[in-house]
Design a protein with these regions (language model features):
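Short hydrophobic alpha-helices at membrane interfaces in multi-pass membrane enzymes
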Residues: 119-125, 157-197, 228-232
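Membrane-proximal stem/loop segments at transmembrane-domain junctions that anchor or position
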Residues: 262-383
Length: 485
């Protein structure tokens, strides 16, 4: 078998296996009524059939800006062919995710040395195709599959620049010449920024990728002689990000009379109160994913039981009793108004003043671990529990085995990525992928109140590209032979 046929065979087999796994998830474990899924479906259908990007408020179809329009546009495109079918949307996501597998493999190959790119590409496509975590999200009507694709494409494009094994794009003297923007429309910085801009219309935090790129370039080009290159790259990426957002911002200005390039931080309607005091309180202790279900996702809709709150959320019995009284007050009305929210905020302030490192360091670090190492079974009929091992094994062995399998697979991907990062530490592009994973993780650990494991799935294109590097093997060829391979 020729190397080319071997490559094609591996691609075909990997994509076939990946398609089978994703289709199984979509047909066996579809999720249409969880989280924002019903909201996205309604937004897309109203936009497609009634020409209004909105949903009923007090019985009246009302234009809103609560979600950026990228994913509803994707759903509307699917619905225009298949009707209001969540299953059709999932199958479209299966196809899109298989394309993402190829993009990730290309990214992995670009990071590898020339002589190993074929092997690393094959490893990358298999690792991406068989990844159950990204694959499982094709079975839910949420943004993850689309934004992972756009993130992978953006990274691949940006790796064509100085961020990866690309070319130097500008001499310092060009800053004062007409050539400063020569070739801008085809420049990897501009094109990568454009892809990130479209990704921002799917998930508003996608520009974290541009911030990561900027940090890498800032460290590399901190000397005055390199400032021209730094300024040019920053301008091109910034303009690229903004251009796709302009139509959305214009729509919000003309329809809602509001300056909004993204979406409201807490997806609130105009005049709707956001209980930030409650969030301040949970930020002093909440780091486990299970506690999100029991607290944050119940606010203003369900009762919150003091018995569901872990003991480490209280510094004393008196504080626990105080919080019990506050929660009783909430449970009577199932609404957190400004007065009640102030009580949560006061408890949060007191807890932070007593233990500032807990709020600002310990909890974010624990959330980091939760983001990366919580069993990624949230879309499956599995409890996600491993402890106590003996009890879980005896009570529900299949559930335990599913959770254990997903935990081990997640650990294998992370360990392979760490090994790949070490092997690639002197190659162009290594630092960009690492910084992106770190920046995105720290952002969600510190500034987002719910440590959901899905928030780091956008790191998986970078993670899998790194995880493929150990499969490069070693070359016995001479340096000259490597260059011609």
């Amino acid at each position: 078998m020729t190397p080319q046929n071997k490559l094609r065979g591996n691609i075909a087999l990997a994509l076939l296996a990946g398609c089978a796994m994703r289709t199984y998830f979509a047909l066996k474990f579809p999720v249409t009524d969880s989280g924002d899924a019903p909201f996205y479906i309604e937004l897309a259908w109203n936009w497609l059939k009634k020409g209004v990007y909105g949903f009923p408020v007090n019985g009246v179809l009302t234009a809103v800006d609560m979600r950026v329009p990228g994913y509803p546009a994707f759903l509307a495109a699917v619905f225009s062919f298949a009707g209001q079918s969540a299953r059709a949307a999932m199958l479209a996501q299966v196809a899109l995710d298989l394309v993402t597998c190829i993009v990730i493999a290309l990214l992995a190959a670009r990071l590898a040395p020339d002589w190993a790119r074929r092997r690393v590409f094959i490893a990358g496509v298999w690792l991406a195709a068989l990844c159950p975590f990204t694959g499982n999200y094709t079975a839910v009507v949420l943004t993850e599959t689309l934004v992972i694709f756009l993130t992978a494409v953006a990274i691949l494009v940006l790796m064509q620049s100085d961020l990866g094994p690309g070319r130097s794009v500008l001499r310092e003297a060009d800053l004062t010449r007409a050539g400063f923007l020569r070739g801008a429309l085809s420049d990897p910085y501009f094109l990568g920024g454009m892809v990130v801009g479209f990704g921002t219309l799917v998930r508003p935090e996608t520009p974290l990728l541009i911030i990561s790129a900027g940090l890498v370039l800032l460290v590399r080009w901190w000397r005055p002689r390199d400032w021209a290159k730094l300024i040019r790259a920053g301008v091109l990426m910034g303009v690229g990000v903004l251009l796709p957002l302009v139509p959305w911002a214009a729509r919000n200005w003309f329809v809602l009379h509001d300056v909004q390039f993204l979406a409201p931080r807490y997806s609130e309607l105009p005049g709707e109160y956001t209980p930030l005091g409650f969030t301040d309180w949970t930020n002093t202790w909440l780091w486990r994913y299970r506690d999100v279900y029991l607290t944050q996702w119940k606010v203003n809709s369900e009762e919150i039981s003091i018995d569901d709150i872990p003991a480490y959320a209280f510094d004393s019995d008196a504080e626990r009793q105080r919080m019990s009284d506050i929660l009783d007050e909430y449970n009577d009305v199932l609404t957190i108004d400004p007065a009640l929210d102030a009580k949560f905020r006061e408890v949060a302030r007191e807890r932070t003043s007593r233990h500032p490192l807990r709020t600002y360091v310990a909890v974010p670090l624990k959330r980091t671990l939760a983001l990366w190492f919580t069993p990624r079974t949230e879309l499956l009929p599995s409890s996600g529990k491993l402890w106590p091992v003996r009890s879980e094994w005896e009570d529900d062995r299949p559930d335990f085995l599913v959770t254990l399998s997903f935990t081990l697979i997640n650990g294998i991907y992370v360990l392979l990525a760490l090994a790949g990062a070490w092997l690639a530490r002197r190659r162009p592009g290594w630092s960009f992928l690492i910084v992106f994973c770190v920046v995105r993780t720290l952002f969600f650990a510190k500034f987002v109140e719910t440590p959901e494991p899905r928030y780091v799935l956008e790191c998986f294109p970078a993670l899998i590209a790194l995880a493929a590097q150990p499969f490069a093997g070693r070359s016995n060829q001479s340096p000259a032979a490597r260059r011609t391979n």
